[in-house]
């Protein structure tokens, strides 16, 4: 094998390692979605209150992303990822041993700090280690790891939780994380900090109106998504009257659809940059609006989950790609902000979903989410017209 082939092969192995890590982190962030009822039963709490663990987790990530990125900006990236995983593993062990909801929340906060650093640097690292000219495919592979968390991680976490208890799910994640850590340490090259930026980068980034608009759009649309998705498990069981097995299948279909979303992104986002994003938001809003009307027909609800899963994946990838392009001179700061604001949306959506569930009923989570998605669509239309030149391409 020549040196060029070795370099390219090594680069792809590094991207695969990061995709595997993305699978782990996204699995643990959202696996409580499939375990809300079981966790609530263990601590004698309603699911609307247990769901707030999603809000607290997400908001810790949002608050910690930028400070943690700045504190670690001079640390070699492979060493930093190893440290992140050690905290991640220890916190999962505590989750599995949690003797109260407060201890469970403490462990989740530890995981959230690890998450904050991981997602602030991972997308830019995937682009750095990818073979020349393959940056978009590297992001697509990273997205595949994220998607597989939805396809396999969350449903399997639910299956394990139902069979062996939710604590076993967290312990299993800790075990898989150990294997992933060993793979990361072996496959990643030395990665000195590069284009990480500093606090001086913030005024520069906020003077880019197209970028600021993307950030606001992310918060609005992700809030819409998680108003409904955070409580899809109790919605499926209580409103749609689906069995536990059917609910697991619903989560499986939602996650699996994300694979097709990443394929659509790879093929069409650069050819139709404005239309692609608008179509993704429109499809998301339509999915949320149809959640209640189709709940009486489980088959149609499962079909709807395919459109829903594809649309949110397309939206997330399109936003991430644009942020990286619009802030190529301060990628780590820009992605820390993106990760933080994405989690502001997750937390806001989970909180809003909790309020809606308690005051209006679980049946209303889709309609409220759809209203937010409509606001996001209008904002995206404004951005497409106002910042057409800056947003005309998503290429890296």
Swiss-Prot record:
Membrane topology classification = Multi-pass membrane protein
GO MF annotations, alphabetized: carbohydrate transmembrane transporter activity
What does the UniProt keyword field contain? Cell inner membrane, Cell membrane, Membrane, Sugar transport, Transmembrane, Transmembrane helix, Transport
Cellular component (GO) terms are: plasma membrane
What the entry lists under CDD domains is as follows:
MFS_NepI_like (cd17324)
Q: Transmembrane region positions?
A: 15-35, 50-70, 81-101, 103-123, 136-156, 170-190, 209-229, 246-266, 276-296, 298-318, 333-353, 365-385
- Where primarily located? membrane
Instruction: Check the record and name the InterPro entries matching this protein.
Output: MFS (IPR011701), MFS_dom (IPR020846), MFS_Efflux_Transporters (IPR050189), MFS_trans_sf (IPR036259), Sugar_effux_transptr_put (IPR023495)
Where is the protein localized? Cell inner membrane
Summarize the protein's role: Involved in the efflux of sugars. The physiological role may be the reduction of the intracellular concentration of toxic sugars or sugar metabolites.
PANTHER family xref list: PURINE EFFLUX PUMP PBUE, SUGAR EFFLUX TRANSPORTER
Describe the family membership recorded for this protein in Swiss-Prot or TrEMBL.
Answer: Belongs to the major facilitator superfamily. SotB (TC 2.A.1.2) family.
Protein's name according to its UniProt entry: Probable sugar efflux transporter
* Provenance organism: Pseudomonas aeruginosa (strain UCBPP-PA14)
Its taxonomic path starts at: Bacteria, Pseudomonadati, Pseudomonadota, Gammaproteobacteria, Pseudomonadales
The gene is: sotB
């Amino acid at each position: 094998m020549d040196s060029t082939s070795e370099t390219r092969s090594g680069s792809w192995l590094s991207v695969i390692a990061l995709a595997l890590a993305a699978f782990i982190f996204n699995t643990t962030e959202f696996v409580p979605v499939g375990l809300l009822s079981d966790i609530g039963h263990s601590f004698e709490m309603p699911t609307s209150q247990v769901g707030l663990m999603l809000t607290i987790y997400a908001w810790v990530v949002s608050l910690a992303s930028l400070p943690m990125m700045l504190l670690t900006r001079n640390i070699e990236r492979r060493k930093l990822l190893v440290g992140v995983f050690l905290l991640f593993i220890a916190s999962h062990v505590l989750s599995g041993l949690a003797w109260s909801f407060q201890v469970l929340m403490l462990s989740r906060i530890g995981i959230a700090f690890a998450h904050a650093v991981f997602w602030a640097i991972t997308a830019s690292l995937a682009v750095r280690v990818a073979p020349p000219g393959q940056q978009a495919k590297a992001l697509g592979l990273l997205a595949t790891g994220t998607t597989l968390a939805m396809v396999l991680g969350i449903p399997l976490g639910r299956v394990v939780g139902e069979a062996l208890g939710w604590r076993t799910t967290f312990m299993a994640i800790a075990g898989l994380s150990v294997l992933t850590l060993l793979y990361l340490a072996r496959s990643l090259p030395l990665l000195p900090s590069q284009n990480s930026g500093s606090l001086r980068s913030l005024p520069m980034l906020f003077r880019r109106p197209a970028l600021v608009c993307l950030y606001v759009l992310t918060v609005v649309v992700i809030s819409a998504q998680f108003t409904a998705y955070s409580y899809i498990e109790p919605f499926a069981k209580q409103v749609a009257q689906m069995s536990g097995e059917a609910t697991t299948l619903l989560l499986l279909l939602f996650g699996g659809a994300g694979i097709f979303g990443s394929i659509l992104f790879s093929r069409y986002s650069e050819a139709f940059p404005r239309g692609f994003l608008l179509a993704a938001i429109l499809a998301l809003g339509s999915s949320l609006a149809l959640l209640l009307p189709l709940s009486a027909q489980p088959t149609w609800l499962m079909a709807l989950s395919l459109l829903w899963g594809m649309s949110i994946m397309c939206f997330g990838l399109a936003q991430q790609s644009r942020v990286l392009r619009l802030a190529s001179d301060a990628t780590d700061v820009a992605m820390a902000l993106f990760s933080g604001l994405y989690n502001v949306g997750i937390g806001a959506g989970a909180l809003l979903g909790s309020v809606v569930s308690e005051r209006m009923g679980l049946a209303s989570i889709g309609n409220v989410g759809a209203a937010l998605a409509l606001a996001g669509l209008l904002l995206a239309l404004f951005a497409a017209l106002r910042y057409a030149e800056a947003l005309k391409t998503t290429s890296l």
